[in-house]
Amino acid sequence: MSVAEQIRTIAAEARQASFAMAKLSSAAKDQLLLDMALALINAAPHIIEENKKDLEAGQKRGLSAAMLDRLMLDEARVKGMADAIREVAQLPDPVGEVTGMWKRPNDLMVGKMRIPLGVIGIIYESRPNVTSDAAALCLKSGNAVVLRGGSEAIHSNLAIATILKAQLAKHGIPAAALSLIPFVEREGVTEMLKQEEFIDVIIPRGGESLIRFVVENSKIPVIKHYKGVCHIFVDATADFEMAREIIVNAKTQRPGVCNALETLLIHKDIAETFVPFIYEALTTLKVELRGDKTFRQFAPKAAKATEEDWYAEYLELILAAAVVDGLDAAIDHINRYSSLHTESIITGDYANSQRFIREVNSGVVMVNASTRFSDGNQLGLGAEIGISTTKLHSFGPMGLTDLTTTKFIVYGSGQVRP
């Protein structure tokens, strides 16, 4: 069969498997996930060996340190993947939940019940842990899933998917409930995006070019998981030590992830003292700062920021920085350049914090906290499918509930419409 025919078959079989998934009890799904987690732990040496093939190929291709970090699996990360699956198993099952019930004047009882989306297609790059995270979330929420990982992680993804699929068979569940498209060529993505008859939604996670390609070519509704151009605004009333700790954590703890800080905005009234203070703290940690004209007045050794820097997701120890006139200017800057991921304000002014929360247009908005908390586990969702930068059908970190929709249920006692 051609690539197109094989992908159509994968999608069609996933559609059939989705009906079986939707009928599974919570207990059956939870036991499946627990067995999947154990299988990953037992197969860790094999997964790590396959991952080494991807790392070696990535080094030969000249992948950046950030990309290689995303790609790398060791024993601790495999354990983390298994732990994430176990956490999903412990979460309440949203399927079948009645979210509201009301009585009509004619005594009809009307309600809304949560149901699976059906078949979810996920297209992603670099991180092999997405394979297990996505599988766990989709299966727990009663969906089938079709995965298409990046070519740079093909050996890792195939190893993980094969281990997980084996558990489906042991539980008497159609193996097609979890499929990984094995083709690394772009044609595999193109054909997947044509399967609107079988796939209900596409969730792309990756760089700008991938997101744009999916949006422009998909016949299926898309929930974008775009890059993370995350901002922190240091207000005039900010505590300097708090600000330093938050900024250092947000930028340096793990710079190669989408919730790391990429642009720092500083209120002009504190620039003279705060800019040198934070410049020293960050450069000591080997962060390169690229500042606007005013920032560089107080930190002359900083590089000059260009217009492109305000849009940049560096994913490394580089930070764009600007001095702004105040809260209005900070909000305007964020709403202009943000990728709608995560933004934070550091302030001692309650009124300013509330304005920031109301007026900043991103999926996660924080007060006096590191952007690194923008994560499903950290926010109490369990493992996440990703962080949506699309307002429909979900916005921000997507957990189990976001992989369901609702249908109306109506109870009558013989009513007919007059």
Curated annotation (Swiss-Prot):
Its main location: cytoplasm. Its EC number is 1.2.1.41. It comes from the Bacteria. NCBIfam families: PRK00197.1, proA. Belongs to the gamma-glutamyl phosphate reductase family. HAMAP family: ProA. This is Gamma-glutamyl phosphate reductase. It comes from Geobacter sp. (strain M21). The gene is proA.
